[in-house]
Amino acid sequence: MSIDFGLSEEQLALRELAHDFSKNEIRPVAAHHDETGEYPWGVLAKAHELGLLNTHIAPENGGLGLGAMDGMVIAEELAWGCSGIGTAMEANGLAEQPVILGGSESLKARYLSPMTESGRERPIMCAYAVTEPGAGSDVQGLKTTAVKKGDKWVINGTKMWITNAGVADWYFVVAVTDPAKLARGGMTAFIVEKGWAGVHVGKKEYNMGQRCSDTRGLTFEDVEVPEENIVGQIGDGWKLAMAAFDYTRPAVSCAAIGVARAALEHAAQYATERKTFGQPIANHQAIQFMLADMAMEIDAGRLLCWKAAWMKDAGLRNTKEAAMAKAFCADVVMKTTTNAVQVYGGYGYSEEYPVEKLMRDAKIFQIYEGTSQIQRMIIAREMLSRGK
């Protein structure tokens, strides 16, 4: 059995494309979008024309059909530029993935194919609408319901912390269709369009970090959804919602590595320029150890991401490995950005320097797509249930 830690020529080209895009299009406007919270439509439009959006949609629906490993190299570079803008760009993938996995060909043609079309005034966006005010980590506690009435399903309920909610054209929604079963076949997934009667979009949340990412609540009030907008089969909602994470958690983890890498680069450069006691602080062992720890943990995290992605591309179950990558990389980015601020000292606490933004942006990685504590529960469950 051979092991290859290198990227293919195609993946190297993807990484170069994404890195150059981040350097030239994302980083120059990152501070503006952080300060204003303005959604980065201009950046997204350019990314869409380059093919950096919706990369996992299959060729038969107009996409590139990229694999999980391909997505890793793109996600890291986009987040290296700005994780807030990167999240705005990558959020489509979480809503698309359940449709890719379980949607009918008709559903894919209606909702995925238009997302790959060029020449639009703005890209079509979508959002994964599962979390609720009382059901975050505990997805089995969902209260949103869908009741069959005639040839339609009527949805009522509230969703919370939905990324892209205000800009999305459609939502992947999970609702309870059989309260007696819940996660064991009692939840069903639907595609709900933003413009339908009864869909109400809440106010934008102004968060600690990743401020240009559009996060809002959604309320569904007697929203009528046609039968053909069910994703998969009745009762597949929980399964599809969770299956998507095996694809997206490695990418989110690699995005965390992109932020950590940016923090390390800034800290290392500053350490060579800042002088104390007549020499650069990089000459002091205390600083060297901090930088060395950052570098070790970033490389270790990236390898966890790559393994989880490789397993998914190989058709192997990667739930445990995806959770390992997510938990480890989320903690790494929080530690790395915090230590980058420490290397800068008082300057690191100032908005005039880049590391305070990176530290604010980092925290959410320990929360969204499953908290670090939930990831550890998943890891333990997988280990104990499978005996390995």
Go through each PLM region and give its residues.
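A short, Trp-centered hydrophobic/proline-enriched beta-strand micro-motif
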Residues: 121-131
